Amino acid sequence: MRVQDKGIIKNYDFDSFILGTSMVMSTSAREAGEKLGGKWVNVSLAGSHFNERAVILQYIFRQKSVARVIYSLDTAQLHEASMKETANWDFLYDNNEFNDIKIYINQKYILCALQFSSSTKCVGSKDLETLIYWATRVEEIIYFGGFNKWLENKKKIAVQEVIKKLREMQTISPFNTKPLTESVERQQRYIEKYLFSFIKEHPSTQFDFIIPPYSRLWYRLDNLEFPDSFSKIKILLKWFVQEVQTLPNAKIYGFDDLDYADDIANYSDLIHYNTDMNSMQLDAIANGTHILTPENIDEYLQTMENKIKAYDLAPLIQEIKK
């Protein structure tokens, strides 16, 4: 989508955009339109960092009058605040149309041109509603429904790694959050540059931030390797909520205090949830629920932490050893 988004944004009549990682790639633009109004399209980029999405946002605002943006605030990217290389595609979004030809100078497109092919592989799909859906693909559906589904279908590398970690676990360590000793100023500057700047520059556009609820298992395993990770996430989320409170055209929504993330049956791996959560997120935006504020963020984070601590790894380990 880093390449395809250019044509979609330029050539289609949309005024509202879903932009995030794979966590919102299966959010229905049609459903968003029905629940929120507006003409929606999903232009999310799998595994995208904030600096990548900033390239897309800049182009969107140059091309369109934007009513609304739904943006996934992935906690992994939030606390890493790392840059991802964009040089091999960001020239598509500059003001020079002539250099766009560079994207076609590769074996794939040269072969397509020589064959005058109109196949989907060469020209893409016109069905923008399902173009980037992943949760309805057969190879993903087989992992939903319980941890036994993970054990039955081990092709996914992410699932293989989880099974390996649990199998090799000698003792079950409790979820202990190590206090953060480093500053988060770098992350705050990163968020200000690649995210808050757009909110401030475009006060007539509504920004809705979704915190994707990773499974409790993800946090338990992440804590073993990075014991201060959750402390950093808490500090940054509290700061983010405080900042959003000062921006009248932005809201942030959280779902980690629900029971949903307790059930691994809702996930195809450690972080990717089923489409019912995408619908719940749209409902929250439409109904004004699950909004995080300075008044409720402490209780929200405490509930989230308590649920992570209470998550029992023993049944999963026992199932592996059967």
Question: Which residues does each PLM region occupy?
Answer:
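Short catalytic/ligand-binding loop motif for oxyanion handling, primarily in non-cytosolic enzymes
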Residues: 26-27, 77-82, 215-220, 261-264
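Well-ordered, non-membrane alpha-helical segments in soluble/globular domains
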Residues: 54-55, 185-195, 229-242
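Secreted/periplasmic serine-hydrolase-like ester/acetyl group-modifying domain
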Residues: 72-73, 82, 86-204, 300-322
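Active-site segments of SGNH/GDSL-like serine hydrolases
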Residues: 199-225, 254-258
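Substrate-gating cap/lid alpha-helix
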Residues: 218-253
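Acidic carboxylate-rich catalytic motifs and surrounding loops in phosphoryl-/glycosyl-chemistry enzymes
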Residues: 250-264
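Histidine-centered active-site loop/cap adjacent to the catalytic His
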Residues: 266-313
